[in-house]
Regions:
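Sec-dependent N-terminal signal peptides
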Residues: 4-13
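Subset of outer-membrane beta-barrel
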Residues: 17-340
Length: 340
């Protein structure tokens, strides 16, 4: 009964926090948009449909409950040239502590190249340079309560900065994964980025103003500061279904379907498939943001290689993904991992 209680609780908490309507998408009303970028080449190549996949370290971002498939130790590093010259990096490690559960750490960063500081008076540049950086430091924990039901959670520190202004907050993710008795079909649910609002503050928001420019003899300049609003985090509730169409010693064909309910857009669906040959070579494809209006995302493709070092239990994993982004062209991700 506990597994049904936790899943019901997750559903209730999600819908109590996600204020959405069918007519208002609320696009552009949340902060820390980098948290919505899929932090894994495997899941990204499957159309971002990974909530119900038991993917080890790959599950830390999508659904931390899926980390319970980590046998001993796993680590992964991902690098991606994101759209508009932005650089995206993701690093994660996970360790199996036996009966105590699974712990994990991850770091996500997003950075822009330096650019000139421009003002109305100096449109060609002031001689100063600025950049923008986003950072998320994440601590994860997952535990298998039964051989069919797992729970997981993330606690993360989130920071955003641009020039001399920054914002930071703390957030949490919750996840559950249940293996049904029907051909081992998996059900997953997760709630991501539940935390306090973010507000940009800093020296670059200061300015001087003459409160009464029409009169002489008064205080000529008064130091002031632009007041910025607080914006919520991009809260996302995911529910997923996955399973195997073919599952033999040499061949495996898996499918995954996710439905997403965010607080800053309308709902959409992601679908994906993965073919594995001898658990060594992988082909993946998917479609993301199905049924969502005004989306640039769509087809995803990917491949992977899992190579076991001779005479050891250590395996090296290489994963590649391609995601079409319409007018923004495409995004390619490459990750390398190790597990044993």
């Amino acid at each position: 009964m506990r597994k049904y209680f936790f899943i019901t609780l997750l559903f209730s908490l999600s819908y109590s926090q996600l204020d959405n309507t069918e007519t208002i998408s609320k696009t552009g009303t949340t902060s820390a948009q980098f948290l919505k970028i899929g932090a894994d080449a495997r899941g990204s190549s499957m159309g971002n449909a990974f909530t119900a996949m038991s993917g080890g370290i790959s599950s830390m971002y999508w659904n931390p409950a899926g980390m319970t498939s980590i046998r001993k130790f796993e680590a992964v590093f991902l690098n991606s040239d994101w759209i508009a010259g932005i650089t995206y990096n993701y690093t994660a490690v996970g360790l199996n502590l036996g009966q105590a559960g699974i712990i994990g750490l991850s770091m996500t960063s997003l950075s822009t190249p330096e650019d000139l500081v421009r003002t109305v008076e100096k449109p060609n540049g002031t001689g100063e340079y600025f950049d923008a950086n986003d950072l998320a430091l994440n601590l994860s924990y997952a535990r298998r309560l039964t051989n069919k039901f797992s729970l997981g959670a993330n606690v993360k520190y989130i920071s955003q900065s641009i020039w001399q202004s920054n914002a930071n907050t703390i957030a949490a993710d919750l996840g559950a994964l249940f293996v049904t008795p029907f051909n081992n079909i998996r059900l997953g649910a997760s709630l991501s980025n539940y935390g306090a609002d973010m507000q940009m503050l800093g020296r670059s928001q200061k300015f001087s103003v003459d409160p009464d420019p029409n009169n002489q003899g008064n205080v000529e300049f008064v130091n002031a500061m632009y007041e910025t609003d607080k914006f919520p985090l991009p809260l996302i509730f995911r529910v997923g279904l996955s399973g195997e169409i073919i599952n033999s010693d040499k061949n495996r064909l898996s499918f995954a379907i996710d439905a997403l309910h965010p607080n800053d857009n309308l709902e959409w669906v992601n679908i994906g498939m993965e073919y594995a040959a001898m658990n060594m070579f992988f082909l993946r494809t998917g479609m993301s943001t199905l049924f969502r209006e005004d989306t640039e995302e769509g087809l995803t493709l990917g491949t992977g290689l899992n190579y076991r070092l001779a005479g050891t239990s250590t395996q090296i994993k290489l994963d590649y993904s391609y995601a079409a982004f319409g007018r923004l062209k495409n995004v390619q991700r490459l990750s390398i991992g190790v597990h044993f």
